[in-house]
Amino acid sequence: MVNKIADRDADANIIVLPADHLIIKEKTFLEKVELAFDLASKHDYLITLGITPTRPDTGYGYIQFIEKKEEEFFKVKTFTEKPSLEIAKAFLESGDFLWNAGIFVWNVKSIHKAFQEFLPEMTHEFDTCEYNNDKESVCIETIYPKVEKISIDNGILEKAKNVYVIPADLGWSDLGTWTSVYENAEKDENNNAVKSKHVLTYNSKGNIIRLRNNNKAAIIDGLENYIVVDTEKALLICPISNDQLIKDYVLDLKNFKKGEKFM
């Protein structure tokens, strides 16, 4: 993608955004992006937006920064993949960690140079393609299965010395967890987030309830702060506080005899 854009504009700035995130404070977001574009235009920086954490969440990666007073952006010290709850609590208390939202801004020259330095073999492969013509897709389809499978964080950002972060309070949520879906969903008078046609609740509060099959009904009595998700192949019932354990549940289910058929 860098080569494709650079072929059209050798001085272009790029923003990389996940598709499944919710940003409520749009004005603040645009201001932070404008600052990032300005920095990327003037400096050889790789820039990321870091989200001000509101809780010790083990579902997100974390960015540690080196603070300098009266600055709107800071040099990145470390990236940490999804930590344990104990470590996440320590990160939150320290005050110098942000959530990694996967939002990046850079100039095509800066990111291409970083690819050349840290992922030279991959860069060489894609540099052989011709872009913005009929040959592009065939070339990429040939190369893509052969190159190293690695994230931009592991491949470049954890190694580069010119990575900067802009702290941002965006009203942000990664809709990849049930907790975040619940936080942003419409709720009834008992704070139940129900998105199914045929659900009756009694003495139940603070639950998120999802039924995939609209021809199925559910009656729930006495649950408080639970996740109830019924798919075509599996039923999940667990406390919302155990949201971060769902990946472990899925792994255990896969390890069942013929467990794959429930995925």
What is the meaning of each model-derived region?
Residues 51, 65, 81, 108, ...:
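Active-site donor-binding loop signature of nucleotide-sugar glycosyltransferases
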Residues 47, 56-59, 72-76, 87-88, ...:
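Glycine-rich, flexible loop/turn motifs
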Residues 102-106:
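Short glycine- and hydrophobic/aromatic-rich loop-to-beta-strand nucleating segment
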Residues 65-98, 132-133:
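A short, charged helix-loop
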Residues 36-38, 50-52, 64, 88-95, ...:
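A generic local secondary-structure boundary/capping motif
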Residues 108-263:
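Left-handed beta-helix
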Residues 1-68, 113-118:
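Conserved beta-loop-beta/alpha segment of the NTase-like Rossmann-fold superfamily
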Residues 9-12, 42-46, 58, 73-75, ...:
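Short coil/turn connectors at secondary-structure junctions
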